[in-house]
Design a protein with these regions (language model features):
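Gly/charged, well-structured mid-domain segments that form the phosphate/adenylate-handling core
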Residues: 107
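Conserved TIR/SEFIR loop-to-helix hotspot centered on a Trp-containing motif
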Residues: 83
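Active-site PLP attachment segment
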Residues: 86
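Nucleotide and nucleotide-moiety/phosphate-recognizing core
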Residues: 1-80, 90, 94-103, 111-115, ...
Length: 161
């Protein structure tokens, strides 16, 4: 969802290296958007393949992910760090290391006796949907902040919002 907020509706997604990609301009920078087409837990395969093909350094990677440890609609920006139990991030870290910035979007805790993978793929309840949509609507401004001012400024502006 977050990547779609950055996409150019006049362009088509291209299938390559286990991902759908699109080049866009953000804050004067040419940016490669990517949506891995692997299983979520294998996202690192697509990320590593694209980074190798396009010769992208790990510190030029920006990853969006969901986070069940954040309330719905909360945003957390990080310069680097652990996977925090998120299997897609875990796989990316296994493939390229952990020295890349990431933006996490809260999806709330998984209810007891509910399958976690079904929880993160499920539609939001009518009560939670507005909070998540508000968070996702901040993506263009957040990413522009990242390119113009850096991840630290994004952390100041958006963490906990």
């Amino acid at each position: 969802m977050a990547v779609e907020k950055l996409a150019d509706s006049s362009k088509d997604w291209k299938s390559e290296h286990k991902a759908l990609t699109m080049k866009v301009n953000i804050a004067g920078e040419e940016v490669l958007l990517a949506k891995p087409q692997t299983y979520m837990n294998l996202s690192g395969e697509a990320v590593q393949a694209l980074m190798t093909w396009y010769k992208v350094k790990v510190d030029h990677l920006l990853v969006f992910s969901d986070d069940i440890n954040l309330d719905v609609g909360r945003i957390r920006c990080r310069k680097d760090g652990s996977h925090g139990g998120q299997n897609g991030l875990r796989n990316i870290i296994e493939h390229v290391g952990d020295k890349f910035p990431r933006i996490r979007f809260g999806v709330g805790k998984c209810p007891p006796k509910f399958d976690l993978s079904n929880w993160v793929l499920a539609k939001f309840s009518p009560e939670d949907r507005p909070a998540f949509e508000e968070a996702i609507s901040k993506v263009p401004a957040l990413v522009e902040c990242y390119f113009k001012l850096g991840i630290e400024k994004c952390m100041e502006r958006y963490n906990g919002k």
